[in-house]
Amino acid sequence: MNADVIIVGGGPVGVALAIDLALQDMKSIVVERHDSIQQVPKGQNLTARTGEHFRHWGVTSAIRAASPIPRSYGSGGVATYDNYLSDYHYEWFNRARIVDYYAATNERLPQYRTEEVLRARAAETGKITLMRGWSFQSVEQHDHGVVVDITMTQGGDSQTISAPFLVGCDGARSPVREAVGITQTVDPHDRLMALLVFNSRQLDERLAIYGEKAIFNAISPDMNGYWQFLGRVDLDGNWFFHAPVPPGTTRENFNFEELLCKAVGAEIDVDFTYVGFWDLRLSLADTYRQGRVFIAGDAAHSHPPYGGYGINTGFEDARNLAWKLAACHGGWAGAHLLDSYTAERHPVFASTRDDFIVKSILEDRDFVDSYHPERDLAAFEAAWNRRAGGDDSLVTQYLPHYEGSPIVCGEAGAVSGATGRHGFTARAGHHLAPRPLPDEQDLWDMLGPGFTLLDLTGNADLQRRFDAATKPRGIPLEILDLAEAGLLKTYGAEAILVRPDHFIAWAGSANDCDATGIIDQATGA
C-alpha cells in the first residue's frame, strides 16, 4: 500500500494534517493504534487561530454543531484565590480580547468531539486511508522515501507501507520519534498530576454565581504555583479537573473527592467517571525532522494542560508542514524548505514553554509565597488587585511568529518565538490579520491556496515581476489588486506576500523589491 505521506497517529493533529494534505491533492495513510476515539475531555480551549484552521479545512459549522457548550459562554474564565468560591476572583484568560485580529472566533468543545468532526471531514476527501487498530513498528529511509512496518494492535496481521514522507503525530511517547533517534530536552517539575472527570449538578449550582463561564483556576497557597484547573464539559453537570497530587498517588490510595471539594470551597456531590495521571514535565524535541521523517503535535512538544497550548500548537504544526510537503510534491520547493519546519516551529514552542507556561508557574508561586490574606491583608489585596487589573498577558501577549525564519524576508538578527503584541501592521513572519473589504467582501476568502500577493497600490509592474518569478517554476500565486480597498494605511506596506498558511513571507515597497529574490527565499531555494 502506497501514499504520498504516511501519518502515524490518528488523533486531532494527525487527521488535521491529512485533511490539509488532501486539500492540496495529496493522498495519505493514517495509522491509528486505537480502534475508537478516546473519550477523555481535554484539548477544549481552542483559539481563534485554530478557528481559522477549521475554516480552512471546511469544518467550522460541524465544529460548532458538535460543541456541547453554548457560544454565549465565550472563551474566558475566572481566576480565584485558594478555592473557586473565594471572595477574591477576577475575569481571566479571555481570548475574545484578540479575536479582531483573526478571521474566525474561539471554539470550545471536548477533544473527542473535535476528532469526530475531523474524521468525518477526512472521509469526505476521498484521499485519506484511516487504518484503525494498527500500530507503528519500524521505519527504513531511502533516497526517495520511507518503508514503514505496521502490525495490528491486538496482534495478528502485519503490513509494509511506503511513501515519500512519514510524519509522527503519535503523542508524547512517540514511537516514530524514538525509532529515528530524535532526542528531547526535558524540563522536569517532579510533580504528579491527576486528571479527574466527573459529574456534579451541585457544582453547576455553586458556580452559577459567575454567570456563563466555562473555565476556572484556583491559585492556592498549597500548590506551589501549579494550577488547580476546572473546566466545564457540557451543561449537564460534567466537568474535568486537574491538580498536583502527592508522589505515589493511585486511584485506590487517595481521596480525590476531598481534593476536589477543597478546591471548590464547599462539599458537593461527585460521581467520578475517569481518574488519570501524568508527570508534570515539559519536553521539546531537539529537531522536528530526521531525513524524510517529521514529527508534529505532542510527539514534537509536550507539556501539562496549561492554557490549551498543546492542541492549538499541534494544529499550527500541521498547517506549517502541510504546505511545505505539498510544495515538494508539486515540484516547486527549494532545497531548504523542509528544514524550515523545525526552524519555524521549534522556537515557537520553546518560547511558549519559557515565556508562558513556566513563567505562569513561577509568577503564581512567587505570588502565593509573597502574599497571604492572614499575614498581611492590605498587601495581599493590593497585589491581588494588580493581578486583576493586568492585561491578561497569557492571551494578549501570545503571538507565535517566525521573524527569524530563513524563509521569511524579515529584519536581520530577528528571532522567532511566541511573544508579541497583536496589531494590523503587516510584519514579515507574522500572521496576516484580515481586514474587511468594500462591498462586504472577505479578504480571507480571497486568499489563494498557494501564495497570495496583496498589491495595495495597483502597481502593474509589481504584479508582472511576481508573475514572472513564479509562473515558470509552477509556484502557485494569486495576485489581488486591492488598490481600491483602502488598506495601505492599515497594513503599513504597499505590497504583502502571504504564504499558504496565511503567514507573511514579505511586506514592503512595491517599486524597489526583488520579486525573484523574495520568492526564492520564501520557497527555501
Regions found by a protein language model. Name each.
Residues 14-15:
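N-terminal Rossmann-fold NAD(P) dinucleotide-binding loop
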Residues 234, 249-313, 333, 348, ...:
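FAD/FMN-dependent oxidoreductases across multiple families
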Residues 124-136:
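A conserved beta-strand/loop element that lines the FAD pocket in flavoprotein oxidoreductases
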Residues 39-42, 46-121, 222-223:
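Active-site-adjacent segment of FAD-dependent monooxygenases/related oxidoreductases
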Residues 22-43:
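Glycine-rich FAD pyrophosphate-binding loop
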Residues 315-329:
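An active-site-proximal "capping" alpha-helix that borders the catalytic cofactor pocket
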Residues 63, 120, 138, 145, ...:
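Conserved FAD-binding catalytic core of PHBH/FMO-like flavoproteins
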Residues 1-4, 8, 23-24, 33, ...:
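Helical substrate-recognition/capping region of FAD-dependent monooxygenase/halogenase enzymes
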